[in-house]
Amino acid sequence: MTHVKALAIKGIMTIIVLYLVLGLGFGFTFGDTLLMTIVLGVISYLLGDLYVLPKWNNMIATLADFGLAFLVIWLMGMPLSMGMTGGEVALAALFGAIVMAIGEYCFHFYMMSKEIGKKHYLETRTDS
């Protein structure tokens, strides 16, 4: 249940951030933004929140989330954007990734306070 709650919080944060930046700022549709939210949310939760954050620290996990957000938004944004140049999509991805990184930095405090991901990390570390 803790993962469901964490994913819900992350999903709400991500859809709000991406719609404000990409939808209102760059003209992406809500459907495109929702699709990016789902893909980015699942990948960043598994890699950033459950693997990188428990293993290293908040700053490293935030930097990883920034890079991941930029890549996902840029790569998904290229075919989804109508009439935007590659540079415009990259700019949208940069702004989206910056705001997502700020949100992820705060979200990581929630993850650490609930020790979500820590148990999995400790189990895999003691198994080897």
UniProtKB/Swiss-Prot annotation:
Coiled coil: none annotated. It comes from Bacillus subtilis (strain 168). It is found in: Cell membrane. Pfam families: DUF2512. The chain crosses the membrane at residues 11-31, 34-54, 60-80, 89-109. Its main location: membrane. This is Uncharacterized protein YcbP. The lineage of its organism: Bacteria, Bacillati, Bacillota, Bacilli, Bacillales. It comes from the Bacteria.
